[in-house]
Amino acid sequence: MKRVTGFPTRPDMVQQLLNVGFDYYNLPSSDGSHYWSDNVAYEFTLAEIDRIEDTTNELHSMCLDFAADEIKKGDYENYHFTELQKQLIETSWRNQEPYLYGRFDFGYDGNNLKMFEYNADTPTSLLEAAVVQWQWLEQIEGLKHRDQFNWIHEELIKHFQFLKQQSGKTDFHLSAMQDAGREDWGNVDYLADVAYNAGWNIHQLAVEDIGYNSETKKFVDLNDQPIEMLFKLYPLEWLSHAEFARHITTAETRFIEPAWKMLLSNKALLAKLWARYPNHPHLLPAYFTPFELPKDLSMWVKKPLLGREGANVFYYEKNNGVEFAAKGSEHSTFYGNSGYVYQQKFELPSFDGMYPIIGSWVVGDVACGMGLREDFTAVTGNDSHFIPHYFVP
């Protein structure tokens, strides 16, 4: 892996980005730079791509096996689930409710490929990974005979067709919070377009506009149309605290992602996987308390179980018990109440002062592409940039 700079800006870059719905390309970072640039990319070898793909498939399979065992045992210790959340998890698993996608975040230093977390419920940067970076590869000068680990779009089409055939339904609703911003809604718009091309009748609405008809005992949209299939770019742990959450198990709406994904999107997964697969080459040691940390490893990352966008991340020095806020992490009491997990600190490589992480996508059960985000700090947060990639066949 290497960072390559100096690519020319397409003369019509802005129009090309807008053509594919990427109207948030110019989200500003603190230094004034934009979320997207044509001028930078990461280059990989075919062997590196094969390794990332194989690792993603392996870890996804491990996570599914883990979820099955946790639900069978009813072992929800350390997750801080409510009784309703436990019920939703078990009901959705028992009903074999379908799932769509997820994104593994990896650290890679050229030798070690390590899982940081699994964004199994509400991952974003999907439009960027599936469409925008592929458009860049096709249009940028000087990259003939290069390829990209990316058939995300094709897998999404296939999976939406599968969902239609499996469910026997015709209408698909997609939602996010009304004020979620263009990044979230851009991802929802993209998935709506994919679903439409897979044969679904599409309806979009804000999460706040989801209603419940007490006579039909179904969730409905603003037109009182039953919501049978619902993609929601809104965390399950938040949705389960909504007033209508008590009706989820009886309303016959299929939520995507399903409630059992709460087991995988919660960072308790990191410690649980390490206990289940100790010394796995692609996992980092992780524990729930500082008292469990091995003495031979001094530096740890303290992560909130339900944090997002690098929020509320601390560094913890085992040798002296000192804890301090990680540079680049925004801190809020909102995320600190969920509990924490301690994960061994992994030294990300710095390229021109930027720290990249790999986001490897799973659609259904297929690893099918990746995108990279880089930031000025080792914690990837709201200042990050999305960077395209390519490999040399």
Swiss-Prot record:
List of residues binding Mg(2+) 2: 119
Transition state stabilizer, annotated site positions: 103
Record-linked InterPro entries: GSPS_pre-ATP-grasp-like_dom, PreATP-grasp_dom_sf
Keywords: ATP-binding, Ligase, Magnesium, Metal-binding, Nucleotide-binding
Enzyme Commission number: 6.3.1.-
Chain sites annotated for binding ATP: 103-105, 267, 303, 310, 343, 378-380
A Pfam family reported for this protein in Swiss-Prot or TrEMBL: GSP_synth
Enzyme class at the top of the EC tree: ligase
Annotated binding of Mg(2+) 1, by residue: 105, 117
GO terms assigned for molecular function: ATP binding; ligase activity; metal ion binding
Keyword Glycosyltransferase: no
UniProt record similarity statement: Belongs to the glutathionylspermidine synthase preATP-grasp family.
Function, in words: May be a ligase forming an amide bond. Shows ATPase activity.
Protein's name according to its UniProt entry: Putative acid--amine ligase HI_0929
Organism: Haemophilus influenzae (strain ATCC 51907 / DSM 11121 / KW20 / Rd)
